[in-house]
Amino acid sequence: MAKNKKEKKPNKILDFLWRNKKQRAKNCLCLLMIFIVLVSVTLGFVSSKLELITVDSENNNTIVDASEANKIYEEEEFEIIQALESASSYNDFINKWANNGGELRKSKNVLNVLLVGVDGDDGLENGGRSDSIILVSLNKKTQKIYMTSFFRDTWTYMNIGGSDRYNKLNASFFHGGDDALIDTIEKNFKIDIDYYVAVDFSSFTDIINALGGVTLEVEEYEANYINRTTVHTIEHGPAVNLNGYEALVYARIRHSDSDSDVSRTRRQRKVISALIDSAKGAGVSQLNSALDMLFKYVKTDLTKMEILSYGTQALASGWINYDIEQVVLSDPDIFRTGYVGGASVVFVDFPIVAEKVQTAIYGDSNVVNDENSKRAFSHLTLGSDGHYRAR
């Protein structure tokens, strides 16, 4: 999680913003749709737009100097985290892994932002459901943006208000809000998260409609699902334009695939990528309308000056042109679907997944899995119904 640091005065940010306003406004607003995934940021219409964002008042993070936007730092060395060698049960395994004190992987060349799509009557506060959980990692060294989806149904250890609990990953947000969700992901996947951006899904359809929809590939069975379950009729094909409602239904399709949550998270990432493409091709007035809708439904621990600072860096360094790479965690060797009680869950081999995610984002990992490592799945039993249960 972001640490408290000594405050630094930003350098020449506002001068940079207001130079060549008209062209810069469009570039800055296009950047928003990268930052809906990255830091939910825009630089155009600075004063009025930033006032719409809900900012976490407890954040004391440092303003980043835009003059260092292109600087590549030497990588630090990290203490090795050995995978577990013993555990008495699956819950004991994930408890020991989360609380082993392993050093979280981080880099000055990587910005990690947790994007949380929230559903529910209580919206961005406790009580909302984190329906979509995506870690967006901007790596200046590789000049890529990595998107890692976490299954919301992952059965995991979490600490809520000082009490040990075992539940689905998204329950940490429901019971403890942003801090609990970030703490749970950091401890289980051994990655330091710099910031979070929570977006209320109630804004989703209006934002996409304001941008003229999103264009993406739709498989025949996906189109059939939407046509069967809604009053809308869409075609299938390599480039289908979906309006906001259709895109939302598409992103939530879950029971049309044998792998359930795996394909669901894949579709969520596709919609986000398509949203970025729509923003890049939109006019300033379209983007302005989208921002007015979006920012009322955004909560973040970025301060307004940090937003300006990172946005300035993004323009100066061409972050908007970085390739987006999906970090796919669908390897059947690293997860199992099953039940805890009557609830459908995803069991994850956390040491293996943590190593894979770290390697994808940073190019290496401080997690070591070897022949002596205890596998989490040795504590699962396969039932006659083909589903796993923890023991």
What do these predicted ranges mean?
Residues 2-35, 41-391:
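Non-catalytic, solvent-exposed segments at the cell envelope interface
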